[in-house]
Structures are given as structure tokens and as C-alpha cells.
């Protein structure tokens, strides 16, 4: 198995509050292209992510769309039970729909949230059960992904563990590429 851990910013950290936000289109475009590249090179066959609102859920949505073209499995992992319990009804429904679409879902803890140790255990689990990672993250703009990024760097000290970073410059390039591709598709002259 060749397993990829995908994580990154939460939706609020990117000021994305709607599924119709153009930034979301660009993020999914960038993730889809990244996944396709790894799939075509035979470097992954599982895309594994968390359930946080933002990059993690969007990555799984993009991966699920690729299952029509590629032989890739998807997994949604949570650090504790009842992960979405405090979310509003709409976000809980999105989470539920996602759990029904992925190939595998589980929690790394058998208990609801009790302590930050569950989050550390989740990071350890993800590192030990994946072969590489990608983060949509910019070290110049730290946020929640900073903790996963630091855990990955520490893990790399004793393990071969490739990590790719898609930063804001990469997203800007993806936005320009997306715009160019769609301008050509819509050019009727």
C-alpha cells in the first residue's frame, strides 16, 4: 500500500464560508492535479485525511471524484469519537455524507474528546500508517496545520517520510492555470 496523508488549513483560516467560493474551486483544482500526478506515477493508492472542515474534507471530496478515473481508495480518520458533535446541522450533514462516500472511516480513539493527548495520538497514528504527506500550508502564515507540520518534521528525523507543501504561491499558480484553461474552453471565437 502507498498511503498519502492530506491535511491543511481549516475553512475559516482561509475565509471560505461557502461551497461556491472561488478559492475552494482553486484548492480542489490544485489537489486534484496533485493527486493525479501521484496516481499516474504509481506513488499512491490510498488518500487518507481527517474530518476537519476545510482542506481535509475538500481533499476527500476531490479524491472521491477521482475514483471514476483511477484505482484509489479513500479513508477518513478522526482523533476521537463524536468528532462533529458540536458542529451546526449543515456541517454535520456534510460530515455524515462524506463518511458514507469514503472507503473506510474510523477514529484513533475509542472515546469522545477528553484531552489534547488524543490529538497527539492521532498525529502519531497518521504518521505511522501513511507513507507520505501533503499539506496545503504556508509556513509564513501559520495556523492549525502548524502542529501537523511540526509533527511531520520531527518524524522525518528518524524516518524516510516525503512531504509536499502546497503554499499560497502554488495556489496562485493553480488559480492562474485554472483561469487560463477555462478561458480557452469558453472562447467561442
UniProtKB/Swiss-Prot annotation:
UniProt cross-references to Pfam families, sorted A to Z: YpsA
Signal peptide: none
Domain of life: Bacteria
Family: Belongs to the UPF0398 family.
NCBIfam families named among the record's database cross-references: PRK13660.1
Protein name: UPF0398 protein LGAS_1023
Organism: Lactobacillus gasseri (strain ATCC 33323 / DSM 20243 / BCRC 14619 / CIP 102991 / JCM 1131 / KCTC 3163 / NCIMB 11718 / NCTC 13722 / AM63)
